[in-house]
Amino acid sequence: RMKEEPLPDTPLGRAGVDPVMIERFRKFTHLMEKYGLKLIVGIVTGWMSGRMHKPHAFQGLNVLSDPFAIRWEVRFVRAFVRELRNEPAIVAWDLGNECNCMAVKTSHEMWNWSNAISSAIRLEDSSRPIVSGMHGLKLEDEHNCSAMLADQAETTDVLCTHPYQRFTAHCLIDPVNTLRNAFHAAVETRLYEEVGGVPAFVEEAGSLGPAYSSETVAAHYLG
């Protein structure tokens, strides 16, 4: 259902997509184009700032492995990309913000999800690269592995790093504004490129706000 009404029998309705929201996003892309900005669009974004957001229909489901959830995610992704693929402000598609944090899964389930979403994007738009969008990729398969670096390099076109020392193994050693941490982003991104064999870039970086560092320390780190 969309609000309190059944899904309309339209291409967007059959994908569970509200046309009003599509037009709002389209207007947003036009504003970006007007002011000379470009967009990397994270499509499946349920995980934000340590909290999980998902539709009521997905409550109790593992959104990375449940076939019902993946079916509707693929429908949504195809409809979203199909509607917006002609917007020049969009330079790349991103699977979504740190989707490997959305649920517990095996590396096999994560590969299957990533491949399904990437394939859905490519069915509608093969002209733009697909960015992984994940956080903390693993080099080796571990118990409840978040996501394998090699698997993301296989299923997407571009890898990205979110180099927060607090959430990276063996990196919470020095103060945020010291020399070793200053090289964290560059070293991790270079590692992704060398191991994955695809381009990589720093997608997020920062000091995690006043809970971890003062404004003075944060300015020193980012400056």
Question: Where are these predicted regions, by residue range?
Answer:
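Short glycine/Trp-rich loop-beta-loop segment that forms part of the substrate-binding cleft
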Residues: 198
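Active-site-adjacent alpha-helix of alpha/beta-hydrolase-fold enzymes
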Residues: 221-223
